[in-house]
Amino acid sequence: MKRRYKVLGIVLVLLVAMSATLASALSHNSPCGSAPALPGDTERMKAIVYRCYGSPEVLKLEEIAKPAPADDRVLIKVHAASVNPLDWHYMRGEPYLVRAMAGMGAPKSIHMGVDFAGTVESVGKNVTRFKPGDEVFGGKHGALAEYVSVPENGSVAMKPANLTFAQAAAVPIAAVTALQALRDQGKVHSGQTVLINGASGGVGTFAVQIAKAFGANVTGVCSTRNLALVRSIGAVQVIDYTKEDFTEGSQRYDLIIDTVGTHSMWDYRRVLKPDGTLVMVGALDKGRWLGPLWGSAKAWLMSPFVSQKFIFFLADLDQADLGVLRDLMEAGKVTPVIDRTYALSETPAAMGYLEQGHARGKVVVTVN
């Protein structure tokens, strides 16, 4: 018996030592590399790049190679982009799970940003859906640049005619996330009671409006300074979280969309109806290892044992849903909320502001 405990103790010590070593390795960021020289005949563009993980100061405005034309792709001149929590997770390389895809000591890809809106400059010979001069919006890694190249069938669609480029750039990731959380995961329908926790943020402001467009009765949770904003975009009830804990109230909801992760799933169970659904969106767990994956695991473990549903998901940015959102916006049912606008050279400041976690709606970067 003593031998068994001794072996177990040695194993535990080794596991702790291995974890500490791995943590040390992952927390070590490689030095920022310098920009390579471009051949003299290279077509160039300005773009935000990052060559190492860290704070917003690692983001640099550089000249890099302009995307080359391709038969099945659309070359877009970017007029505006927007920043998302996804961007600063990649910028910092946290949670460490991100580095499994982005690179361990340093990023594999130097490009930054996803959301964009702009004008089609040229199309490949096989492209039939778009033509030069079309105003479009969508998502493509490397959107914080003067140009992006997108597959014809990729995440790009005609821009809503009633939106500016800045407004359209605010849409893709946040609005598609809100749409899919409500429609696909939450199965929202007319007459339901829906609560949006984090109603004044990027995803939240879209979720309030989309839920209302589906006929739901929407309650928004936000801070004191954002009460009027959330009410103005369609919430029939607004709760100030600095004065009231909605999980201690008597109201029960058919669907809760949680964009901020301020309560446990046990808290949410109290205010969900017996057959209600909680949809958790984004980086709810700030842990440096697994981040949102832990929220997904908890939801998966709990759901089989209760009548309520607990879902964690990440959105799939696709062309069809960009079209759905375009229709909602052209019908006047959804309008992007923009907090601040920065120039491309000010992207580090834009990312720093977003990272504080108090943006009202979206943070936009103008490119051209």
Describe the role of every protein-language-model region.
Residues 2-8, 40, 316-368:
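C-terminal hydrophobic helical "lid"/dimerization subdomain
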Residues 9-21:
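Hydrophobic membrane-insertion alpha-helices, especially the h-region
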Residues 66-82, 96-142:
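Glycine-rich beta-strand-centered segment in the early N-terminal region that forms part
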Residues 102-115, 122, 135-198:
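NAD(P)H dinucleotide-binding glycine-rich loop of Rossmann-like/cofactor-binding domains
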Residues 169-240:
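Mid-domain Rossmann-like dinucleotide-binding core that forms the NAD(H)/NADP(H) cofactor-binding site
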Residues 247-255:
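A short acidic, Gly/Pro-enriched loop at the edge of an enzyme's catalytic core
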Residues 263-334, 367-368:
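Glycine-rich phosphate-binding loop and adjacent beta-alpha segment
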